[in-house]
């Protein structure tokens, strides 16, 4: 009986997506709400550590950090347990990556978007039982078609995922099945063998 490492486990996740560009690109294109002309084509890995600018600043580390050929940054986190602080940490890390793009000689027009993809192995939005992908942007209070571009956040509640809930993105289904079912499938097979 073959045994697989849980792809959600910290080290396994970082090995898969932090060392294999093609897998990371596929994951980003499948799970982020990117239009056809916005798809990621190639990436350059960046240090996952966001070191503070001075000794009193807060150090932070993400699971995977990269940028594409357009200069957009992508932060990817796999979080096993939801805590209210996690959402704040995500905002902190994305904001830090965003503001660090410019030094005092560069113009604001050169800022590129930062996308934060957060896979959570716990249900945290119980009020929305049928929704498991949550996308956030900075939008106008009254006119949600008016947005300030720059920071985008995607949270995915893995336990809510059912393969039939996504129809338009086949790769999204495959990646989410990989993240949620590979270890469960092995466990079921082992129980069947023991029975």
Identify the role of each PLM range.
Residues 1-195:
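Elongated, amphipathic alpha-helical interaction scaffolds
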């Amino acid at each position: 009986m073959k045994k697989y490492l849980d792809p959600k486990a910290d080290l396994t996740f970082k090995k898969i997506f932090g060392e294999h560009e093609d897998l990371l690109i596929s994951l980003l294109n499948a799970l982020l709400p990117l239009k056809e002309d916005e798809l990621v084509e190639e990436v350059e890995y960046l240090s996952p550590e966001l070191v503070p600018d001075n000794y009193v600043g807060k150090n932070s580390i993400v699971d995977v950090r990269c940028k594409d050929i357009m200069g957009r940054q992508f932060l990817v986190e796999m979080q096993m347990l939801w805590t209210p602080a996690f959402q704040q940490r995500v905002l902190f890390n994305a904001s830090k990556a965003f503001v660090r793009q410019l030094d005092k000689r560069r113009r604001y027009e050169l800022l590129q978007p930062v996308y934060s993809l957060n896979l959570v192995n716990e249900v945290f939005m119980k009020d929305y039982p049928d929704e498991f992908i949550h996308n956030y942007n900075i939008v106008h209070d009254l006119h949600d078609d008016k947005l300030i571009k720059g920071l985008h956040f995607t949270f995915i509640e893995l336990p809510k995922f059912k393969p039939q809930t996504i129809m338009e993105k086949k790769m999204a289904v495959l990646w989410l099945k990989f993240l949620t079912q590979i270890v469960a499938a092995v466990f079921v097979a082992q129980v069947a063998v023991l029975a």
